[in-house]
């Protein structure tokens, strides 16, 4: 009986016990919207031939802009153009000895490449070795005064020793390159930088280079040790004038960097509201390098006579009407202190009578048909331009057309920039289009329907007599004169130095150029005037013009960036690390 009662109680208790309810499934969190990466689009005319700012072959406004954002420099130009120490790279840089002249650099311990390799003494050594011994580089004279680069403190301190005092030393070791990646790279520093830069030491890095689409994407360098860039990406997109205007109107393009010319101004004139435009001179002077080492122009009188046949102003007005006429070998027209040094007449101005006299005094003569000959053979000049520089090609065609009218057989050829500016030679690829130049002077006929000689020279290559190309400006004037027009003299460090592509060397001028390079660049105007006068007599090159760019920006881009032309040697994108994304 007791067992039955216990069994009943157990059943009743079980019936009264509350069965727990199943817990509801967990509520999935609401997805949070990820912000779109911030981006700013810059329209550019061309991507250029490469990204090495030390090579004439890679010289372009885009190369200058990218280098300022990606490559480390010990000194950068301040608002007044005076070099200022970039403490993100070096905490100090000073002259520590005058005998021998020695500069000591203490590098920022945090400064490193995007590969996490420290920015160190080996990068100084690499740039010095390349600049002193390679052809086709810009402003090498200062590096050729260096006798040693010594490393201390595990590579974070550098002592640079010179063979003589060099007051312009602050202009050296800008745009350092990653030695650990380039020193053994195939194609050396030319081939390895043609399609980009392998590492960054600045606030941005090159993320992609798509030559087919015409686009370079800079991304924030997440390994940068200092204040990071505000923007996630900066897109540099190749566009023609019409596409730039359309993109600005639609808001697809925020800033445009174009050549200043009537075509872009016409395209922009149809926009409402009209975007803001600012002129931005480029850090180059377009010139005609005249081959003096051999060939028909080896005599200075022949070079002067050739120049007296050309209408430089007609060429400028036809190719780059807003460019600044360049009438000096040193400072560019946009630089403080510039003064024209060109003589009033030939060879700076067209003068057919003077040209005839100069050419005859150099041994030239006219044949029965009126064409020029030398050494009993018809004069046949090759006018070369870089295939990657279309404006230079237009100059080459105009020069060829003017000389053809004057009775000189000419052939205009294109060459890869690396070949033209290093070797002074070109393959026999004819520029077939011919444009008659505008005429501004009745003294030298400049319009003609005659085309240059169409038959290419025999063989796989040809020495170029007239090289259309850039001369870099913006550095120490004495250094630039010595770099561009000095003799390639052997030293204990560089026993076989490269010459310029034209091979120019005038020993009587060499000591003066060396003294100007070793001076402050501003302390002796009379010596600079003497150098200019001799250069106009010897004429290693004929200056044409300083190209001028146009910085175009929408109101929204202005508010977000405060864009300006920037320092001459860095350009309008110099402050892009601080830019914000424009309001859309």
Each model region followed by its residue ranges:
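Extracytoplasmic/peripheral linker and loop segments enriched in polar/acidic and small residues
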Residues: 33, 316, 411-414, 418-420, ...
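Surface-exposed binding/hinge segments that line
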Residues: 106, 140-186
């Amino acid at each position: 009986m007791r067992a039955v009662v216990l069994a009943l109680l157990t059943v009743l208790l079980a019936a009264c016990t509350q069965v727990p309810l199943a817990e509801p499934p967990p509520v999935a969190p609401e997805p949070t919207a990820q912000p779109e990466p911030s981006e700013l689009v810059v329209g550019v005319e061309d991507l250029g031939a490469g990204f090495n700012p030390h090579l004439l072959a890679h010289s372009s406004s885009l190369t200058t802009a990218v280098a300022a954002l990606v490559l480390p420099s010990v000194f950068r130009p301040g608002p007044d153009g005076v070099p200022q120490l970039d403490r993100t790279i070096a905490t100090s840089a000073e002259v520590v000895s005058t005998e021998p002249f020695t500069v000591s650099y203490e590098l920022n311990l945090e400064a490193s490449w995007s590969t996490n390799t420290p920015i160190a003494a080996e990068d100084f050594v690499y740039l010095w070795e390349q600049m002193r011994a390679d052809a086709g580089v810009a402003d090498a004279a200062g590096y050729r005064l260096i006798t040693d680069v010594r490393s201390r403190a595990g590579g974070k301190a550098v002592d640079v020793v010179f063979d003589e005092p060099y007051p312009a030393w602050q202009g050296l070791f800008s745009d350092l390159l990653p030695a650990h990646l380039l020193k053994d790279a195939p194609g050396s520093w030319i081939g390895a930088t043609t399609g980009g830069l392998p590492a960054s030491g600045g606030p941005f890095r090159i993320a992609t280079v798509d030559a087919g689409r015409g686009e370079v994407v800079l991304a924030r360098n997440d390994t940068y040790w200092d204040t990071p860039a505000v923007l996630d990406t900066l897109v540099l997109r190749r566009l023609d004038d019409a596409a730039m205007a359309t993109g600005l109107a639609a808001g697809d393009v925020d800033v445009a960097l174009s050549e200043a010319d009537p075509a872009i101004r016409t395209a922009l004139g149809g926009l409402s509201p009209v975007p803001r435009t600012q002129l931005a001179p480029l850090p180059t002077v377009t010139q005609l390098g005249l081959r003096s080492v051999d060939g028909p122009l080896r005599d200075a009188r022949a070079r002067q006579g050739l120049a007296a046949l050309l209408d430089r102003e007609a060429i400028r007005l036809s190719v780059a009407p807003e460019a600044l006429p360049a009438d000096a070998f040193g400072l560019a027209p946009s630089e403080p202190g510039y003064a024209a040094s060109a003589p009033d007449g030939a060879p700076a101005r067209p003068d057919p009578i003077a040209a005839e006299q100069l050419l005859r005094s150099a041994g030239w003569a006219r044949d029965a048909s009126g064409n020029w000959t030398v050494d009993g053979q018809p004069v046949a000049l090759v006018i070369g331009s870089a295939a990657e520089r279309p404006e230079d090609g237009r100059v080459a065609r105009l020069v060829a057309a003017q000389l053809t009218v004057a009775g000189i057989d000419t052939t205009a050829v294109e060459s890869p920039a690396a070949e033209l500016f290093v070797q002074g030679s070109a393959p026999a690829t004819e520029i077939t289009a011919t444009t008659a130049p505008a005429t501004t002077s009745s003294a030298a006929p400049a319009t003609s329907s005659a085309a240059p000689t169409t038959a290419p020279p025999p063989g796989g290559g040809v020495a170029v007599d007239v090289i259309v190309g850039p001369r870099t400006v913006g550095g120490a004037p004495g250094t630039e004169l010595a770099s561009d027009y000095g003799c390639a003299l052997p030293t204990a460090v560089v026993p076989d130095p490269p010459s310029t592509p034209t091979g120019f060397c005038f020993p009587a001028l060499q000591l003066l150029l060396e003294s100007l390079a070793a001076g402050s660049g501003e302390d002796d105007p009379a010596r600079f005037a003497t150098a200019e006068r001799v250069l106009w007599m010897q004429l290693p090159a004929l200056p044409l013009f300083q190209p001028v760019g146009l910085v175009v920006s929408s109101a929204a881009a202005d508010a977000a960036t405060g864009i300006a032309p920037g320092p001459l040697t860095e350009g309008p994108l110099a402050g892009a690390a601080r830019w914000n994304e424009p309001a859309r």
